[in-house]
Amino acid sequence: MCSIAVHPTIQSVNLFEILQGKYAYVKGQTLYSSVRNSGTFFRQVFTNIYRDALSSCTYEDVLQDWIKYETSIRQRWKPSEKEDNAFKWSTFQSWFSTMKMTIDGIITKAITYIINTKCIASYERYIDWVATCGVVPVLNQRPNSKVVQMFKKHLEKEYSSVASSKSLTTIFHFLVESASSVLERLTSKFIPSYLEVSVTYDQYKCEYKASYQNKEIGVEVIIPPTIGSGKVVFNSPVQRLAENVMACHRTMEHAKICQLLNTGPLKAIVCSSSATVYKDILNHLDECGKKNDPKKELMQLLIKLAENKTVNGVTDVVEDFITDVSNKLVDRSKLFGDVNAEHPSDNLKKQVSNNVFKCLTQQINQQFETISKLEEERAFFLKKINQIETQLSKCQEEPQGTGGKPYNILTSSTLDALDGLSQSGLHLTSNQVTKGQSIVNSFFSQYVPPFRELQNDLHELWEHEIMQSFNLSPIIDNQGQRLFVRYTQDTIFFLLGPFTHNILGFVDMELLIEAYCTLSFYDIAEYLYSASRLAIYIVDIGQKYCSQPNLSDGSQS
């Protein structure tokens, strides 16, 4: 084989299912949601667009806007010479404040529109691939021109608010072009889900290949897996957690099975009763023939003897049998007058005690052994028939072409889970204990294996693995409780860097700095505006036009 399957395999699919919370989802895993949150990426987009937009204007444009604004204000308000300094300052302050508010509103609306566009490259899927396999399949496609045109129409509605300002118009046109270019790039990249794509590794070319809808697409390697001897071992965080997650899940599953087995409606061990067997034999003999049969009478004698456990009982049974049979015999001594002859009952006693009793006892024992074997075979075949009937009934209930519905014993209803367990080798049925056998072990105890400690350990392990693997920084309150986590600069280099430059192709886009990771768009705008080219121009114009008035002088006048 020249290629090795990387995904989908049992190992890789299992890692994605762990991320989705299918196995032993604990509190520590919620930390992963902070990693895959796309807010940090969009803050980076906002930062670059905002900074570049403010740098697009020129000093001449800003100066002309100020002169135009100041002239219109003076035409409406004619201050005295004493009030001229304060008038200049208030006019200048209202001008640059309204300009900043307009810029913030337009750029924030543009970024909000981009964030809410559903057809852009998914940052969440990118993080899922990095956390599981370490490789990311990427599909290059045509930009969604319809989305871009709708975005431009959305921004054109704001043009009326900036049409009177030359500098704001310049910023607005730059924003439309820059944001449209970003949106085109975001819609030209697609990261498929793990159910839609297959990834292989070419051993000869030493490169990864992916297939999506029968098309070959590119693969970006973030954390290279270890490949050798036809096997793939992922070096991802979830791979390191997988064994502990599955161990905790299996323990929880075991506990659930114990709970289900211990909540059965009725549980009993049935032992066959000898009296019941003997009665069945007698009824069978009665049905076979109603005539007096010597074998039948002797068999009845042996059965009654077996039922009696005391000496007196045995004596009474024998006496009754001899009396009953003796009444049917002809007494020749009375008939022919032979005084010395023995009574027939005496001869009968001797015959019963000697030959006939021994022979019939052996025969009856053989018959009982045969009956016992037949009962075992009957129980075995009844069990098989019940299983076949259950399978047939399920097949009849399911529509054709559909497979069996998988059930989860942790989440299914109790009755459904019990029914599923009955078909999985854990039969909740009663079995007869045959003669010669005894119970050497029982499972009547209400034992449920503990799993809380495993869950707590797994919770801490998730936290440590996520924090250390992605270099996250915790935000703690005054009581020492962690409120949330944020990206550090190392996290940005490790996750945002490849996504921005390698996958999306924003080569000129600067990475976000750590201080902006948890700030709102308006807070970021405050910092960016204070260090922008536009702010420098405005400060220079303000210093040349007016100085901040002395409030004490103004109050004295």
UniProtKB/Swiss-Prot annotation:
Its main location: virion. Keywords: Coiled coil, Host nucleus, Viral genome packaging, Viral release from host cell, Virion. One of its GO terms (biological process) is chromosome organization. Pfam families: Herpes_UL6. It is found in: Virion; Host nucleus. InterPro entries: Herpes_Portal. GO terms for cellular component: host cell nucleus; virion component. Homododecamerizes. Interacts with terminase subunits TRM1 and TRM3. Belongs to the herpesviridae portal protein family. Forms a portal in the viral capsid through which viral DNA is translocated during DNA packaging. Assembles as a dodecamer at a single fivefold axe of the T=16 icosahedric capsid. Binds to the molecular motor that translocates the viral DNA, termed terminase. This is Portal protein. It comes from Alcelaphine herpesvirus 1 (strain C500). The gene is 43.
